[in-house]
Every structure is written in structure tokens, then in C-alpha cells.
From Swiss-Prot:
Protein name: Adenine phosphoribosyltransferase
Subunit note: Homodimer.
Residue runs in coiled coils: none
Subcellular location: Cytoplasm
Listed EC numbers: 2.4.2.7
UniProt xrefs under Pfam families: Pribosyltran
Gene name of the encoded protein: apt
Lineage: Bacteria, Pseudomonadati, Pseudomonadota, Gammaproteobacteria, Enterobacterales
Matches recorded under InterPro entries: Ade_phspho_trans, PRibTrfase_dom, PRTase-like, UPRTase/APRTase
Pathway terms, separated by semicolons: Purine metabolism; AMP biosynthesis via salvage pathway; AMP from adenine: step 1/1
């Protein structure tokens, strides 16, 4: 059996992500993580790399942001043997929630989490498919901290390294890890 290095896994993952020009609007080069999901070897490699990085790190919960964060966060939580907590748009969670609003380029949005999903002392790993400006992840970290959880780490499949998200989260005391980096412009 051939041993695959982490660098080879990262290259496989990067090569599985399709770039779509002029989507969703002219001038944007969209990085399509759904093409990674279509490749079972690349998808498995992404989960394995994330799980291996955080195994034995003391993580007690994994939080995934709507919606593609669920696709990576839930399997990583299973691999780590910890619970998975979804962060969703308003009105999608059935139990009592708390919410956090955040600014977008043109307007604002809101995220919610079940108010009983995180306990004081939980060491939470946040996972999403992509880090761009960091607004969604900043709101997610604020929700977790309001419930008493600690967030030291956030992991992504893709980091659009020139859009400022990593710096934004680092400023909140969150260490960012991504499997692949692309320019955002």
C-alpha cells in the first residue's frame, strides 16, 4: 500500500476544486468546493487532514456554519468523537436560540445557534468550507463565546488569503488553518 503525504493530499484537494469565472457576477473567480465533494478520494482526504490536525487537541465540540460547513464539520466531529453543532440562518433551528448579526458588503445578515448547544468550558473548533472576509466566522465565534465556549481554532478547506478573513479572526485570538489557499481577486 502506497503512503500518501499530507502535501500530496493537499494537492489532490486543490486540484479537485473547480474555478468558475464570472460567477456569481462578472470579475469574480468562484472557487467551487462542491466539485471536491464529487470526488470521494479528495473529500475523504479533506476530512482526514482536518481530523488528524485536531485529534488529541482537546476539542469538545465542532461547529459548522450554514450550509457547506455542515458537509465538513459533521464528519470531522464524528472522526474526533465529539458533538457537531450547526450555526444557521434565522428561523431554521427548532429549540431556543441566540442570534448575532453581522455586516456584509451590501447589507447585513444574522446567524443563530441553539442556546443550549455549547456549555461553559467547551473547547470549540469552527469549520467552514471557505474563509474570505471573515464576517460569517466572526459572528459564529461571537455566538459560541456568548454561550461560554472557547474558540481557539477555525479550519477551512479554502482560504482566500488576500481578502482579510484570517487577519480578522487572528485579531479575535483564533488560529486559522486551511487545506488550500487561493487568491480572492
Amino acid at each position: 500500500m502506497m503512503t500518501v503525504t499530507a502535501q500530496q493530499q493537499a494537492e489532490l484537494i486543490k486540484n479537485s476544486i473547480k474555478s468558475i469565472p464570472d460567477y456569481p457576477k462578472p470579475g469574480i473567480l468562484f472557487r467551487d468546493v462542491t466539485s471536491l465533494l464529487e470526488d470521494p478520494v479528495a473529500y475523504a482526504a479533506s476530512i482526514e487532514m482536518l481530523a488528524n490536525r485536531y485529534r488529541n487537541s482537546g476539542v469538545t465540540k465542532v461547529v459548522g456554519t450554514e450550509a457547506r460547513g455542515f458537509l465538513f464539520g459533521a464528519p470531522v466531529a464524528l472522526a474526533l468523537g465529539v458533538g457537531f453543532v450547526p450555526v444557521r440562518k434565522p428561523g431554521k433551528l427548532p429549540r431556543p436560540t441566540i442570534s448575532e448579526s453581522y455586516e456584509l458588503e451590501y447589507g447585513s445578515d444574522t446567524l443563530e445557534i441553539h442556546s443550549d448547544a455549547i456549555s461553559a468550558g467547551d473547547n470549540v473548533l469552527v469549520i467552514d468550507d471557505l474563509l474570505a472576509t471573515g464576517g460569517t466566522l466572526e459572528a459564529t465565534v461571537k455566538l459560541i463565546r456568548r454561550l461560554g465556549g472557547t474558540v481557539n481554532d477555525a479550519a477551512f478547506i479554502i482560504n482566500l488569503f488576500d481578502l482579510g478573513g484570517e487577519q480578522r479572526l487572528t485579531g479575535m485570538g483564533v488560529t486559522c488553518y486551511s487545506l488550500v489557499d487561493f487568491p480572492g481577486h
